[in-house]
Regions:
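Short amphipathic alpha-helical recognition elements used for nucleic-acid or partner binding
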Residues: 377-411, 430
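Signal-transmission linkers at sensory-effector interfaces
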Residues: 27, 135-171, 323
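Short boundary/linker motifs that mark transitions into or out of structured domains
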Residues: 329-389, 441-444, 448-452, 456-464
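Helix-loop-beta substructure at the N-terminus of cytosolic sensory domains
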Residues: 167-205, 324
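DNA-recognition element of transcription regulators
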Residues: 380-388, 416-437
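Short hydrophobic beta-strand micro-motif common in sensory/regulatory domains
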Residues: 266, 275-283
Length: 464
């Protein structure tokens, strides 16, 4: 029975390995597995040309092939009769296929080795269901999204948009977005990472489903799936994630036997057993703001429909973040002047008595590493570390506990970039890290463009 290849889109997600059969000019067949047959449009598919030298030589001699793809939900097989048209080494199709492979390569330490050589494009001469392959599929398996489901998700989109618009600050904006994605769309493992231009990294500012440990995690530009999305500023959707990583690691082991040095593998952020992932860049114009990522243990959790849907949400999030950055700049300018120093709340003698009754925490700043450790455990580094060290030192010298964003911005010792900088995001990161590692020490917002240092322990400062 003939089928339209766009109706069997699940079979092209790469969850079940596909089979490709070719023959050389003398008719000698060659059959091999391929990780994925890429659905181009209703009449064309593409194969990634990476290591299949025999397949490629056969196509040059005899430009016909037969592929078998399998629906991962029904396990129904479909046979495609193909005619080889061309091999593309650049262009939109090549870039799209290459992006996925590059992300997997980076995730497994195979950058530059595990890569796309070309995208081989085929015309689909015919597509048919393999008769007798299975019994009838389960009746509850659906090929698409119902109208009611689409209406529900459109209502969810409206509610997410409302929450973004109502957010009063960056921290509440990020938290409410991730909460809404779980409430309305059951995306239970999500994170938002913001771009740090100075350090060329994206930093996790909010997460849901991972616990507190995810906040503060950094990903360098081009590292792993998230780093690749940030570098290319293009969406990546991965299904059968574990199979892709396993394949990349297998190639890595073969390459490691040679003389070529390989970089260390980067642990996949989030779920260790994630089977699907969707990562979308947050951009305003051509400027990178960050990345939003979602993961799931269901290998078919995200579809092309989710890509389009989350891109709409990502655009709104990016604009919302940009609005908060602008508001933060205004708040910094409106903050108290740098020479305004509130008096300590207690006398020096009273402070010493309070200190004697409190627990003690030792914070060590390692200047060469630009990092702070609390009781020999890593706390934070870079600009947030310098901010914390600045206010801690000021508090110990003068007893001062309240500060303004403006004075931090104009303090050259902190090394803030001269261009527009999301200072508020650095305070959010610092606040979360203190909550995780040193709850006796808090950074508290005290008004627009102002914050305070609150200490419930005696603080010892050590600089090395």
């Amino acid at each position: 029975m003939s089928v339209r290849i766009t109706d069997i889109w699940r079979a092209f997600q790469g969850l079940v390995p596909s089979i490709i059969a070719t023959a050389d000019g003398r008719g000698m067949p060659n059959v091999t597995y391929v990780s994925q047959v890429y659905l181009v449009d209703e009449r064309h598919v593409a194969l990634s040309c990476q290591f299949f030298n025999k397949t490629r030589r056969n196509l040059d001699d005899n430009p016909v092939a037969c592929a078998e793809v399998v629906d991962p939900l029904t396990l129904q097989a479909y046979r495609l009769r193909l005619k080889f048209l061309r091999s593309e080494k650049s262009g939109p199709l090549f870039d799209t296929m290459s992006l996925r492979i590059d992300a997997i390569a980076s995730q497994t330490g195979m950058t530059g080795i595990f890569r796309l050589i070309a995208a081989d494009v085929f015309e689909v001469v015919s597509a048919e269901m393999v008769q007798g392959f299975l019994t009838d599929p389960p009746p509850d398996v659906r090929s698409g999204i119902s109208l009611d489901g689409a209406r529900t998700e459109m209502r969810g989109l409206q509610l997410v948009s409302e929450r973004i618009n109502r957010a009063n600050d960056l921290e509440s904006l990020l938290a409410c977005v991730l909460q809404a994605l779980e409430e309305f769309f059951a995306f239970s493992h999500t994170s938002v990472l913001l771009w740090d231009e100075q350090n060329r990294r994206v930093t996790t500012m909010a997460s849901r489903g991972y616990g507190e440990s995810g906040v503060g995690a950094e990903v360098a530009l081009g590292d792993g799936v998230i780093g690749t999305v940030a570098r290319e500023r293009r969406l990546i959707r991965l299904t059968s994630l574990e199979a892709d990583l396993r394949y990349g690691r297998a190639i890595r082991r073969e390459s490691a036997a040679g003389e070529r040095a390989l970089e260390a593998e980067i642990p996949l952020p989030g779920l260790k057993d994630a089977q699907s992932m969707l990562a979308i860049p947050l951009t305003v114009g051509d400027r990178l703001v960050g990345v939003i990522a979602a993961e799931d243990r269901d290998p078919m959790r995200f579809s092309e429909w989710h890509e389009a849907y989350l891109e709409i949400i990502a655009n709104q999030i990016a604009l919302g973040i940009d609005r908060m950055i602008e508001r933060g700049d205004e708040a910094a300018d409106a903050g108290v002047p740098a020479d305004t120093v509130p008096l300590p709340a207690t006398s020096a003698a009273g402070s010493r008595m309070i200190e004697a009754c409190r627990s003690k925490r030792r914070l060590t700043y390692y200047r060469n590493d630009d990092a702070i450790f609390v009781d020999d455990e890593y706390l934070i580094r870079n600009i947030p570390a310098r901010i914390l060290w600045k206010v801690l030192g000021e508090q110990q010298r003068t007893g001062r506990t309240e500060f303004s964003n403006r004075e931090m911005r104009v303090d050259s010792s902190l090394g803030l970039p001269p261009v527009k900088d999301n200072f508020e995001s650095r305070l959010i990161l610092l606040r979360h890290r203190l909550q995780q590692k040193c709850p006796d020490l808090q950074i508290v917002s005290t008004g627009r463009g102002r914050f305070a240092l609150r200490a419930d322990a005696a603080i010892e400062l050590v600089e090395r």
